[in-house]
Amino acid sequence: MGMWWIVAVAILAHTASAAVREYAWEVEYKFGWPDCKEGMVMAVNGQFPGPTIHALAGDTIVVHLTNKLATEGLVIHWHGIRQLGSPWADGAAGVTQCAISPGETFTYNFTVDKPGTHFYHGHYGMQRSAGLYGSLIIDVAKGKKEPLRYDGEFNLLLSDWWHEDVLSQEIGLSSRPMRWIGEAQSILINGRGQFNCSLAAQFSSTSLPTCTFKEGDQCAPQRLHVEPNKTYRIRLASSTALASLNFAVQGHKLVVVEADGNYITPFTTDDIDIYSGETYSVLLTTDQDPSQNYYITAGVRGRKPNTPPALTVLNYVTAPSSQLPTSPPPETPRWNDFDRSKNFSKKIFAAMGSPSPPETFDERLILLNTQNLIEGFTKWAINNVSLAVPGTPYLGSVKYNLRTGFNRSSPPKDYPVDYDIMTPPRNRNAKQGNVSCVFPFNVTVDVILQNANGLNANASEIHPWHLHGHDFWVLGYGEGKFKPGVDEKTYNLKNPPLRNTVALYPYGWTALRFVTDNPGVWFFHCHIEPHLHMGMGVVFAEGLNRIGKVPDEALGCGLTKQFLMNRNNP
Protein backbone atom coordinates (compact mmCIF):
# COMPACT_ATOMS: atom_id res chain seq x y z
CA MET A 1 0.00 0.00 0.00
CA GLY A 2 1.37 3.44 -0.89
CA MET A 3 2.37 5.64 2.01
CA TRP A 4 1.25 8.98 0.53
CA TRP A 5 -1.97 8.81 2.42
CA ILE A 6 -3.33 9.97 5.69
CA VAL A 7 -6.02 8.27 7.69
CA ALA A 8 -8.12 11.05 9.13
CA VAL A 9 -11.18 9.03 10.10
CA ALA A 10 -11.92 9.04 13.82
CA ILE A 11 -12.63 5.51 15.03
CA LEU A 12 -14.92 5.18 18.02
CA ALA A 13 -12.93 4.12 21.04
CA HIS A 14 -14.02 2.20 24.11
CA THR A 15 -15.81 5.23 25.50
CA ALA A 16 -18.49 7.21 23.77
CA SER A 17 -16.63 10.51 24.09
CA ALA A 18 -13.13 9.56 22.90
CA ALA A 19 -11.86 8.66 19.46
CA VAL A 20 -8.75 7.16 17.92
CA ARG A 21 -7.24 9.44 15.30
CA GLU A 22 -4.82 7.55 13.12
CA TYR A 23 -2.31 8.93 10.64
CA ALA A 24 0.36 7.53 8.34
CA TRP A 25 3.19 9.97 7.73
CA GLU A 26 6.31 9.92 5.60
CA VAL A 27 9.10 12.41 6.26
CA GLU A 28 11.55 13.33 3.52
CA TYR A 29 13.40 16.30 2.09
CA LYS A 30 11.93 18.26 -0.78
CA PHE A 31 12.69 21.54 -2.48
CA GLY A 32 10.52 24.44 -1.40
CA TRP A 33 10.35 28.22 -1.45
CA PRO A 34 9.67 29.16 2.19
CA ASP A 35 10.84 32.77 1.81
CA CYS A 36 10.77 33.14 -2.00
CA LYS A 37 14.23 31.55 -2.28
CA GLU A 38 14.53 27.86 -3.10
CA GLY A 39 15.88 25.60 -0.39
CA MET A 40 15.52 22.13 1.11
CA VAL A 41 12.71 21.64 3.60
CA MET A 42 11.71 18.62 5.66
CA ALA A 43 8.19 17.70 4.64
CA VAL A 44 5.53 15.41 6.10
CA ASN A 45 3.55 13.70 3.34
CA GLY A 46 4.87 16.37 1.03
CA GLN A 47 3.62 19.22 3.23
CA PHE A 48 5.66 22.01 4.82
CA PRO A 49 4.83 22.78 7.56
CA GLY A 50 3.47 19.32 8.34
CA PRO A 51 -0.24 18.51 8.57
CA THR A 52 -2.20 19.98 11.46
CA ILE A 53 -3.58 17.43 13.91
CA HIS A 54 -6.98 18.29 15.37
CA ALA A 55 -8.28 16.19 18.25
CA LEU A 56 -10.51 16.37 21.32
CA ALA A 57 -9.30 15.99 24.90
CA GLY A 58 -9.35 12.30 25.75
CA ASP A 59 -8.68 11.14 22.20
CA THR A 60 -5.92 8.72 21.30
CA ILE A 61 -3.52 9.76 18.55
CA VAL A 62 -1.74 7.09 16.53
CA VAL A 63 0.96 8.17 14.07
CA HIS A 64 2.77 5.63 11.90
CA LEU A 65 5.94 7.56 11.09
CA THR A 66 8.12 6.37 8.21
CA ASN A 67 11.63 7.74 7.78
CA LYS A 68 12.23 8.45 4.08
CA LEU A 69 15.42 10.41 4.77
CA ALA A 70 18.36 8.79 3.05
CA THR A 71 21.04 9.27 5.70
CA GLU A 72 19.45 10.58 8.92
CA GLY A 73 17.60 9.23 11.91
CA LEU A 74 14.20 10.69 12.81
CA VAL A 75 11.88 11.27 15.77
CA ILE A 76 8.96 13.61 16.42
CA HIS A 77 8.33 15.25 19.79
CA TRP A 78 4.73 16.11 20.66
CA HIS A 79 5.47 19.41 22.33
CA GLY A 80 3.22 20.15 25.30
CA ILE A 81 1.68 16.66 25.50
CA ARG A 82 2.49 15.20 28.91
CA GLN A 83 2.52 11.56 27.72
CA LEU A 84 0.87 10.24 30.87
CA GLY A 85 1.56 6.51 30.86
CA SER A 86 3.40 6.66 27.52
CA PRO A 87 6.88 8.12 28.15
CA TRP A 88 8.28 6.09 25.23
CA ALA A 89 6.08 8.16 22.84
CA ASP A 90 7.56 11.53 23.86
CA GLY A 91 9.83 11.57 20.83
CA ALA A 92 13.20 12.63 22.28
CA ALA A 93 16.04 10.75 20.60
CA GLY A 94 18.47 9.22 23.08
CA VAL A 95 16.18 10.00 26.01
CA THR A 96 12.88 8.18 25.42
CA GLN A 97 13.56 6.25 22.22
CA CYS A 98 16.05 5.33 19.55
CA ALA A 99 16.02 7.40 16.40
CA ILE A 100 14.00 5.81 13.59
CA SER A 101 16.45 4.55 10.97
CA PRO A 102 16.06 5.37 7.26
CA GLY A 103 13.38 3.20 5.67
CA GLU A 104 11.86 2.15 8.99
CA THR A 105 8.44 2.93 10.48
CA PHE A 106 7.73 3.62 14.15
CA THR A 107 4.26 3.99 15.65
CA TYR A 108 3.51 6.67 18.23
CA ASN A 109 0.41 5.97 20.32
CA PHE A 110 -0.65 8.38 23.06
CA THR A 111 -3.66 10.04 24.65
CA VAL A 112 -4.16 13.81 24.74
CA ASP A 113 -5.60 14.42 28.19
CA LYS A 114 -6.59 18.09 28.10
CA PRO A 115 -7.38 20.86 25.61
CA GLY A 116 -4.74 23.29 24.45
CA THR A 117 -2.65 24.80 21.68
CA HIS A 118 0.40 22.67 20.95
CA PHE A 119 2.72 21.69 18.12
CA TYR A 120 5.05 18.89 17.11
CA HIS A 121 8.60 19.00 15.80
CA GLY A 122 11.71 16.99 15.05
CA HIS A 123 13.92 16.21 18.03
CA TYR A 124 16.95 14.60 16.40
CA GLY A 125 19.92 16.78 15.59
CA MET A 126 18.60 20.16 14.46
CA GLN A 127 15.77 18.90 12.27
CA ARG A 128 13.37 21.49 13.66
CA SER A 129 15.57 24.10 11.97
CA ALA A 130 15.07 22.23 8.70
CA GLY A 131 11.31 22.65 8.89
CA LEU A 132 10.10 19.50 10.62
CA TYR A 133 7.17 20.93 12.56
CA GLY A 134 3.40 21.29 12.51
CA SER A 135 0.45 22.24 14.70
CA LEU A 136 -1.34 20.06 17.24
CA ILE A 137 -4.66 21.50 18.39
CA ILE A 138 -6.67 19.85 21.17
CA ASP A 139 -10.23 21.07 21.71
CA VAL A 140 -12.43 20.39 24.72
CA ALA A 141 -13.88 16.90 25.01
CA LYS A 142 -17.27 16.17 23.53
CA GLY A 143 -19.95 17.29 25.97
CA LYS A 144 -17.61 19.75 27.71
CA LYS A 145 -17.99 23.50 27.41
CA GLU A 146 -15.23 25.69 25.98
CA PRO A 147 -14.84 28.58 28.46
CA LEU A 148 -13.75 30.98 25.71
CA ARG A 149 -16.29 32.67 23.43
CA TYR A 150 -15.33 33.47 19.85
CA ASP A 151 -16.74 33.36 16.32
CA GLY A 152 -13.83 31.74 14.49
CA GLU A 153 -10.19 30.85 14.90
CA PHE A 154 -6.85 30.94 13.14
CA ASN A 155 -3.73 28.92 13.77
CA LEU A 156 -0.35 30.65 13.26
CA LEU A 157 2.89 28.69 13.50
CA LEU A 158 5.90 31.01 13.76
CA SER A 159 9.42 29.94 12.76
CA ASP A 160 12.76 31.24 11.54
CA TRP A 161 14.52 30.23 8.35
CA TRP A 162 18.13 30.06 7.14
CA HIS A 163 19.43 29.68 3.62
CA GLU A 164 22.34 27.59 4.87
CA ASP A 165 21.37 23.93 5.22
CA VAL A 166 21.08 22.44 8.69
CA LEU A 167 23.87 19.91 8.25
CA SER A 168 26.31 22.74 7.54
CA GLN A 169 25.02 24.57 10.62
CA GLU A 170 25.55 21.50 12.80
CA ILE A 171 29.07 21.00 11.50
CA GLY A 172 29.88 24.66 12.13
CA LEU A 173 28.63 24.51 15.71
CA SER A 174 30.71 21.39 16.32
CA SER A 175 33.88 22.87 14.78
CA ARG A 176 36.94 24.25 16.52
CA PRO A 177 36.70 27.20 16.51
CA MET A 178 32.92 27.25 16.43
CA ARG A 179 31.20 28.74 13.40
CA TRP A 180 28.03 30.42 14.66
CA ILE A 181 24.89 30.05 12.51
CA GLY A 182 24.17 33.79 12.51
CA GLU A 183 20.74 35.35 12.46
CA ALA A 184 17.98 33.85 10.34
CA GLN A 185 17.35 35.22 6.86
CA SER A 186 13.58 35.22 7.36
CA ILE A 187 10.78 34.81 9.85
CA LEU A 188 7.97 32.57 8.60
CA ILE A 189 4.26 32.55 9.41
CA ASN A 190 2.80 29.12 8.63
CA GLY A 191 5.91 28.34 6.63
CA ARG A 192 5.75 31.48 4.47
CA GLY A 193 8.00 34.53 4.45
CA GLN A 194 9.53 37.00 2.03
CA PHE A 195 13.30 37.34 1.78
CA ASN A 196 13.68 39.47 -1.35
CA CYS A 197 10.63 41.72 -1.13
CA SER A 198 8.36 43.34 1.45
CA LEU A 199 4.63 43.69 1.99
CA ALA A 200 5.41 47.10 3.49
CA ALA A 201 8.06 48.36 1.07
CA GLN A 202 6.37 51.74 0.71
CA PHE A 203 7.02 52.41 4.41
CA SER A 204 10.56 50.99 4.50
CA SER A 205 13.94 52.67 4.15
CA THR A 206 15.41 49.52 2.57
CA SER A 207 15.68 48.92 -1.15
CA LEU A 208 13.41 45.89 -1.09
CA PRO A 209 10.63 46.05 -3.68
CA THR A 210 6.96 45.54 -2.96
CA CYS A 211 6.07 41.86 -3.11
CA THR A 212 4.06 40.66 -6.07
CA PHE A 213 2.81 37.09 -6.17
CA LYS A 214 1.27 34.81 -8.72
CA GLU A 215 -1.13 32.01 -7.96
CA GLY A 216 0.60 29.03 -6.38
CA ASP A 217 3.62 30.90 -5.02
CA GLN A 218 4.72 29.00 -1.91
CA CYS A 219 5.97 32.13 -0.17
CA ALA A 220 2.80 34.18 -0.64
CA PRO A 221 1.44 35.13 2.79
CA GLN A 222 -1.67 33.48 4.15
CA ARG A 223 -4.01 36.38 4.83
CA LEU A 224 -6.47 36.16 7.69
CA HIS A 225 -9.96 36.86 6.34
CA VAL A 226 -12.32 38.26 8.98
CA GLU A 227 -15.77 39.77 9.22
CA PRO A 228 -16.35 43.09 11.00
CA ASN A 229 -17.50 43.10 14.62
CA LYS A 230 -16.59 39.50 15.34
CA THR A 231 -14.20 37.95 17.86
CA TYR A 232 -11.54 35.52 16.67
CA ARG A 233 -9.21 33.21 18.52
CA ILE A 234 -5.65 33.31 17.18
CA ARG A 235 -3.59 30.32 18.28
CA LEU A 236 0.13 31.10 18.24
CA ALA A 237 3.00 28.64 18.51
CA SER A 238 6.71 29.42 18.21
CA SER A 239 8.81 26.66 16.70
CA THR A 240 11.73 29.02 16.10
CA ALA A 241 15.23 27.60 16.28
CA LEU A 242 16.79 30.80 17.62
CA ALA A 243 14.58 33.89 17.53
CA SER A 244 12.40 35.32 20.26
CA LEU A 245 9.51 37.11 18.62
CA ASN A 246 7.05 39.93 19.22
CA PHE A 247 3.59 39.50 17.68
CA ALA A 248 1.17 42.35 16.98
CA VAL A 249 -1.86 43.14 14.82
CA GLN A 250 -2.04 46.71 13.59
CA GLY A 251 -4.74 48.76 15.30
CA HIS A 252 -6.14 45.86 17.32
CA LYS A 253 -5.91 44.89 20.97
CA LEU A 254 -5.10 41.31 21.91
CA VAL A 255 -6.68 39.56 24.89
CA VAL A 256 -4.32 36.81 26.06
CA VAL A 257 -6.33 33.81 27.32
CA GLU A 258 -4.13 30.72 27.07
CA ALA A 259 -0.44 29.94 27.58
CA ASP A 260 1.19 26.59 26.81
CA GLY A 261 -2.12 24.76 26.73
CA ASN A 262 -3.42 26.21 30.01
CA TYR A 263 -6.12 28.83 30.49
CA ILE A 264 -4.90 32.01 32.15
CA THR A 265 -6.52 35.08 33.66
CA PRO A 266 -7.32 37.17 30.55
CA PHE A 267 -5.46 40.43 30.07
CA THR A 268 -5.32 42.95 27.25
CA THR A 269 -2.17 44.02 25.45
CA ASP A 270 -1.03 45.67 22.22
CA ASP A 271 1.49 42.91 21.46
CA ILE A 272 3.01 39.80 22.98
CA ASP A 273 6.50 38.38 23.31
CA ILE A 274 6.67 34.70 22.41
CA TYR A 275 9.78 32.57 22.93
CA SER A 276 10.77 29.37 21.21
CA GLY A 277 8.62 26.53 22.53
CA GLU A 278 5.81 28.74 23.83
CA THR A 279 2.20 28.78 22.68
CA TYR A 280 -0.56 31.31 23.31
CA SER A 281 -4.15 31.98 22.40
CA VAL A 282 -5.32 35.55 21.99
CA LEU A 283 -8.77 36.92 21.27
CA LEU A 284 -9.02 39.68 18.69
CA THR A 285 -12.18 41.71 18.01
CA THR A 286 -12.56 43.18 14.53
CA ASP A 287 -13.76 46.62 15.63
CA GLN A 288 -11.70 48.80 13.29
CA ASP A 289 -12.54 50.53 9.99
CA PRO A 290 -14.02 47.71 7.86
CA SER A 291 -12.92 49.35 4.61
CA GLN A 292 -9.25 48.84 5.52
CA ASN A 293 -6.84 45.95 5.96
CA TYR A 294 -4.24 45.70 8.73
CA TYR A 295 -0.70 44.38 9.07
CA ILE A 296 0.14 41.38 11.22
CA THR A 297 3.79 41.37 12.25
CA ALA A 298 6.24 39.06 14.02
CA GLY A 299 9.60 40.72 14.71
CA VAL A 300 12.75 39.57 16.47
CA ARG A 301 13.26 40.32 20.17
CA GLY A 302 16.03 39.41 22.59
CA ARG A 303 18.74 39.35 19.93
CA LYS A 304 20.22 42.23 17.95
CA PRO A 305 17.93 41.96 14.95
CA ASN A 306 19.34 41.23 11.55
CA THR A 307 16.16 39.61 10.26
CA PRO A 308 13.20 41.57 8.84
CA PRO A 309 9.88 41.08 10.64
CA ALA A 310 7.44 38.62 9.13
CA LEU A 311 4.34 40.27 7.72
CA THR A 312 0.91 39.17 6.64
CA VAL A 313 -2.45 40.92 6.46
CA LEU A 314 -5.66 40.89 8.46
CA ASN A 315 -8.21 41.23 5.67
CA TYR A 316 -11.65 42.55 6.52
CA VAL A 317 -13.91 40.84 3.96
CA THR A 318 -15.52 44.24 3.36
CA ALA A 319 -12.20 45.44 1.91
CA PRO A 320 -10.42 44.09 -1.20
CA SER A 321 -8.34 41.04 -0.31
CA SER A 322 -5.31 42.28 -2.25
CA GLN A 323 -5.40 45.77 -0.73
CA LEU A 324 -2.38 46.56 1.42
CA PRO A 325 -2.74 48.62 4.61
CA THR A 326 -2.39 52.38 4.21
CA SER A 327 -0.16 52.97 7.25
CA PRO A 328 3.10 51.38 8.47
CA PRO A 329 3.06 48.05 10.31
CA PRO A 330 3.53 47.97 14.10
CA GLU A 331 7.12 48.60 15.09
CA THR A 332 8.77 45.74 16.95
CA PRO A 333 9.85 46.92 20.44
CA ARG A 334 13.56 47.52 20.98
CA TRP A 335 15.33 44.16 20.93
CA ASN A 336 17.06 44.56 24.30
CA ASP A 337 14.23 46.16 26.28
CA PHE A 338 14.20 43.26 28.69
CA ASP A 339 12.21 45.15 31.31
CA ARG A 340 9.35 45.27 28.82
CA SER A 341 9.67 41.52 28.26
CA LYS A 342 9.68 40.77 31.98
CA ASN A 343 6.66 42.98 32.58
CA PHE A 344 4.74 40.97 30.00
CA SER A 345 5.74 37.66 31.62
CA LYS A 346 4.68 38.96 35.02
CA LYS A 347 1.15 39.67 33.75
CA ILE A 348 0.48 35.98 33.22
CA PHE A 349 -1.52 34.36 36.02
CA ALA A 350 -3.41 31.09 36.16
CA ALA A 351 -7.13 31.15 35.48
CA MET A 352 -9.46 30.87 38.44
CA GLY A 353 -9.91 27.23 39.38
CA SER A 354 -6.48 26.14 38.14
CA PRO A 355 -4.48 23.72 40.31
CA SER A 356 -2.39 25.41 42.99
CA PRO A 357 1.22 24.43 43.65
CA PRO A 358 2.30 22.64 46.82
CA GLU A 359 3.31 25.22 49.41
CA THR A 360 6.77 23.75 49.97
CA PHE A 361 9.32 21.74 48.02
CA ASP A 362 11.01 18.43 48.83
CA GLU A 363 14.05 18.88 46.60
CA ARG A 364 15.65 21.86 44.92
CA LEU A 365 18.02 22.22 41.99
CA ILE A 366 19.82 25.46 41.17
CA LEU A 367 20.95 25.19 37.56
CA LEU A 368 23.65 27.62 36.45
CA ASN A 369 23.60 28.27 32.69
CA THR A 370 27.10 28.95 31.34
CA GLN A 371 29.03 29.04 28.10
CA ASN A 372 32.27 27.08 28.28
CA LEU A 373 35.04 25.37 26.38
CA ILE A 374 35.73 21.64 26.23
CA GLU A 375 39.07 20.91 24.54
CA GLY A 376 38.65 24.12 22.60
CA PHE A 377 35.08 23.39 21.45
CA THR A 378 32.46 25.95 22.47
CA LYS A 379 29.69 24.39 24.56
CA TRP A 380 26.82 25.31 26.85
CA ALA A 381 26.83 23.73 30.29
CA ILE A 382 24.57 23.33 33.31
CA ASN A 383 26.45 23.39 36.62
CA ASN A 384 29.60 22.90 34.53
CA VAL A 385 28.32 19.75 32.77
CA SER A 386 27.57 19.89 29.04
CA LEU A 387 25.04 17.22 28.09
CA ALA A 388 25.99 14.53 25.57
CA VAL A 389 23.02 12.20 25.07
CA PRO A 390 24.14 8.54 25.26
CA GLY A 391 23.79 5.91 22.54
CA THR A 392 21.36 3.91 24.66
CA PRO A 393 18.15 5.82 25.47
CA TYR A 394 17.89 6.71 29.15
CA LEU A 395 14.41 5.18 29.27
CA GLY A 396 15.74 1.79 28.19
CA SER A 397 18.64 1.89 30.63
CA VAL A 398 16.42 2.64 33.63
CA LYS A 399 13.60 0.32 32.56
CA TYR A 400 15.90 -2.69 32.21
CA ASN A 401 18.51 -1.61 34.79
CA LEU A 402 21.37 -1.45 32.30
CA ARG A 403 23.90 0.14 34.61
CA THR A 404 26.41 1.18 31.95
CA GLY A 405 23.92 2.90 29.64
CA PHE A 406 24.76 6.27 31.15
CA ASN A 407 26.72 7.74 34.04
CA ARG A 408 24.79 6.89 37.23
CA SER A 409 26.59 9.39 39.45
CA SER A 410 24.50 12.29 40.75
CA PRO A 411 24.97 15.59 38.91
CA PRO A 412 25.69 18.80 40.83
CA LYS A 413 22.53 20.28 42.35
CA ASP A 414 24.03 23.75 42.78
CA TYR A 415 27.06 25.80 41.80
CA PRO A 416 29.86 27.45 43.84
CA VAL A 417 28.58 30.34 45.95
CA ASP A 418 31.43 32.60 44.86
CA TYR A 419 30.69 32.26 41.14
CA ASP A 420 30.39 35.71 39.54
CA ILE A 421 27.48 35.63 37.08
CA MET A 422 28.20 39.16 35.81
CA THR A 423 31.57 38.44 34.17
CA PRO A 424 32.98 35.76 31.85
CA PRO A 425 33.89 32.58 33.74
CA ARG A 426 37.33 32.63 35.35
CA ASN A 427 37.67 28.95 34.50
CA ARG A 428 36.31 28.57 30.99
CA ASN A 429 36.52 24.78 31.00
CA ALA A 430 33.63 22.39 31.58
CA LYS A 431 33.15 18.65 31.24
CA GLN A 432 30.86 16.59 29.07
CA GLY A 433 28.51 14.07 30.63
CA ASN A 434 25.27 12.13 30.41
CA VAL A 435 24.17 12.03 34.04
CA SER A 436 20.52 12.37 35.09
CA CYS A 437 18.68 13.78 38.10
CA VAL A 438 16.71 10.93 39.71
CA PHE A 439 13.64 11.67 41.84
CA PRO A 440 11.25 9.46 43.79
CA PHE A 441 7.64 9.33 42.69
CA ASN A 442 5.32 12.16 43.75
CA VAL A 443 7.76 14.60 45.34
CA THR A 444 7.77 18.36 44.81
CA VAL A 445 10.82 19.71 43.01
CA ASP A 446 11.87 23.35 42.71
CA VAL A 447 14.15 24.28 39.84
CA ILE A 448 15.97 27.61 39.91
CA LEU A 449 17.33 28.53 36.50
CA GLN A 450 20.27 30.89 36.98
CA ASN A 451 21.61 32.88 34.05
CA ALA A 452 25.16 34.19 33.79
CA ASN A 453 27.60 35.93 31.49
CA GLY A 454 28.86 34.00 28.46
CA LEU A 455 32.42 33.66 27.26
CA ASN A 456 32.47 37.25 25.98
CA ALA A 457 32.11 40.29 28.23
CA ASN A 458 28.66 41.86 28.62
CA ALA A 459 26.93 38.91 26.98
CA SER A 460 24.04 37.12 28.64
CA GLU A 461 21.26 35.68 26.51
CA ILE A 462 17.60 34.78 26.91
CA HIS A 463 17.10 31.03 27.23
CA PRO A 464 13.59 29.56 26.88
CA TRP A 465 13.58 26.33 28.89
CA HIS A 466 11.17 23.51 28.02
CA LEU A 467 10.25 20.53 30.20
CA HIS A 468 8.97 17.33 28.62
CA GLY A 469 6.33 15.23 30.38
CA HIS A 470 5.07 17.99 32.68
CA ASP A 471 3.54 21.36 33.18
CA PHE A 472 5.21 23.38 35.94
CA TRP A 473 4.24 26.39 38.00
CA VAL A 474 6.26 29.53 37.29
CA LEU A 475 6.79 30.91 40.78
CA GLY A 476 8.78 34.02 39.95
CA TYR A 477 11.59 35.90 38.24
CA GLY A 478 14.45 37.88 39.74
CA GLU A 479 17.55 39.91 38.99
CA GLY A 480 21.12 38.80 39.69
CA LYS A 481 21.94 35.72 41.73
CA PHE A 482 19.16 33.76 43.41
CA LYS A 483 19.41 34.13 47.19
CA PRO A 484 18.16 31.02 49.03
CA GLY A 485 16.12 31.89 52.08
CA VAL A 486 15.39 35.37 50.73
CA ASP A 487 14.03 35.19 47.20
CA GLU A 488 11.48 32.50 48.06
CA LYS A 489 9.57 35.27 49.85
CA THR A 490 8.82 36.83 46.45
CA TYR A 491 7.20 33.68 45.03
CA ASN A 492 3.65 33.75 43.74
CA LEU A 493 2.01 30.73 45.36
CA LYS A 494 -1.54 32.04 44.92
CA ASN A 495 -2.08 31.86 41.16
CA PRO A 496 1.18 31.05 39.34
CA PRO A 497 0.69 30.04 35.72
CA LEU A 498 1.16 26.48 34.58
CA ARG A 499 3.60 26.36 31.65
CA ASN A 500 5.85 23.87 29.90
CA THR A 501 8.27 26.54 28.60
CA VAL A 502 9.63 29.54 30.48
CA ALA A 503 12.05 32.36 29.72
CA LEU A 504 15.29 32.81 31.64
CA TYR A 505 16.28 36.46 31.25
CA PRO A 506 19.85 37.83 31.04
CA TYR A 507 21.71 37.98 34.38
CA GLY A 508 18.61 36.81 36.24
CA TRP A 509 16.84 33.77 37.64
CA THR A 510 13.54 32.01 37.07
CA ALA A 511 11.92 29.72 39.65
CA LEU A 512 9.57 26.88 38.79
CA ARG A 513 7.96 23.99 40.67
CA PHE A 514 6.63 20.63 39.53
CA VAL A 515 5.53 17.33 41.05
CA THR A 516 7.16 14.07 39.94
CA ASP A 517 3.84 12.36 39.23
CA ASN A 518 4.59 11.08 35.71
CA PRO A 519 6.90 8.03 35.81
CA GLY A 520 9.47 8.23 33.05
CA VAL A 521 12.58 10.00 31.85
CA TRP A 522 12.08 13.58 30.72
CA PHE A 523 14.25 16.06 28.86
CA PHE A 524 14.60 19.59 30.28
CA HIS A 525 16.52 21.87 27.95
CA CYS A 526 16.95 25.23 26.32
CA HIS A 527 14.62 25.30 23.32
CA ILE A 528 17.08 27.26 21.20
CA GLU A 529 18.17 24.62 18.72
CA PRO A 530 21.92 25.40 18.54
CA HIS A 531 22.14 25.76 22.33
CA LEU A 532 20.72 22.27 22.85
CA HIS A 533 23.02 20.96 20.13
CA MET A 534 25.90 22.41 22.16
CA GLY A 535 24.87 20.67 25.39
CA MET A 536 22.35 22.95 27.13
CA GLY A 537 20.09 20.43 28.80
CA VAL A 538 19.54 18.04 31.69
CA VAL A 539 17.54 14.84 32.13
CA PHE A 540 15.03 14.14 34.90
CA ALA A 541 14.12 10.55 35.82
CA GLU A 542 11.21 9.92 38.18
CA GLY A 543 9.13 7.08 39.59
CA LEU A 544 11.35 4.57 37.84
CA ASN A 545 9.77 1.49 39.45
CA ARG A 546 6.37 2.60 38.11
CA ILE A 547 7.29 2.84 34.43
CA GLY A 548 4.92 0.64 32.43
CA LYS A 549 5.46 -1.43 29.32
CA VAL A 550 7.76 0.07 26.71
CA PRO A 551 7.46 -1.25 23.14
CA ASP A 552 10.62 -3.05 22.04
CA GLU A 553 10.54 -1.02 18.82
CA ALA A 554 11.35 2.13 20.79
CA LEU A 555 14.60 0.72 22.13
CA GLY A 556 16.25 -1.19 19.28
CA CYS A 557 19.67 0.46 19.58
CA GLY A 558 22.63 0.61 21.93
CA LEU A 559 22.68 -1.71 24.93
CA THR A 560 18.92 -2.23 24.86
CA LYS A 561 19.15 -3.80 21.40
CA GLN A 562 21.35 -6.64 22.67
CA PHE A 563 19.34 -6.95 25.89
CA LEU A 564 16.08 -7.36 23.98
CA MET A 565 17.64 -9.85 21.57
CA ASN A 566 18.86 -11.97 24.48
CA ARG A 567 15.51 -11.72 26.27
CA ASN A 568 13.48 -12.65 23.21
CA ASN A 569 15.84 -15.45 22.15
CA PRO A 570 16.86 -17.22 25.37
UniProtKB/Swiss-Prot annotation:
EC number, as in UniProt: 1.10.3.3
Family the UniProt entry places it in: Belongs to the multicopper oxidase family.
Stimuli inducing this protein: Repressed progressively during incompatible Turnip mosaic virus (TuMV) infection (strain UK1) in resistant cultivars (e.g. cv. Aki-masari) but not in susceptible cultivars (e.g. cv. Yukihime-kabu). When the plant is infected by a compatible TuMV strain (UK1 m2), the down-regulation is transient and last two days. Induced by jasmonic acid (JA) and hydrogen peroxide H(2)O(2) treatments.
Residues at which Cu cation 1 binds: 77, 466
Cofactor: Cu cation
Protein task: Ascorbate oxidase involved in a redox system involving ascorbic acid (AsA). The oxidation of AsA represses responses to high salinity and oxidative stress conditions such as vegetative growth and seed production reductions. Negative regulator of defense responses toward incompatible Turnip mosaic virus (TuMV strain UK1) by preventing jasmonic acid (JA)- dependent accumulation of ascorbic acid (AsA, AS) and dehydroascobic acid (DHA).
Enzyme class: oxidoreductase
Subcellular location(s) of the protein: Secreted
Domain Plastocyanin-like span(s) in chain numbering: 33-140, 154-317, 426-543
Pfam families: Cu-oxidase (PF00394), Cu-oxidase_2 (PF07731), Cu-oxidase_3 (PF07732)
S-S bonds: 36-219, 98-557, 197-211
GO molecular function term, any single one: copper ion binding
InterPro entries in alphabetical order: Cu-oxidase-like_N (IPR011707), Cu-oxidase_2nd (IPR001117), Cu-oxidase_C (IPR011706), Cu-oxidase_fam (IPR045087), Cu_oxidase_CS (IPR033138), Cu_oxidase_Cu_BS (IPR002355), Cupredoxin (IPR008972), CuRO_3_AAO (IPR034267)
Stored PROSITE patterns: MULTICOPPER_OXIDASE1, MULTICOPPER_OXIDASE2
Gene3D superfamilies: Cupredoxins - blue copper proteins
Catalytic activity entry: 4 L-ascorbate + O2 = 4 monodehydro-L-ascorbate radical + 2 H2O
Protein name per UniProt: L-ascorbate oxidase
Keyword S-adenosyl-L-methionine: no
GO cellular component terms, A-Z: extracellular region; plasmodesma
Residues the record marks as carrying a glycan: 109, 196, 229, 343, 384, 407, 434, 442, 458
Binding site for Cu cation 4: 463, 526, 531, 536
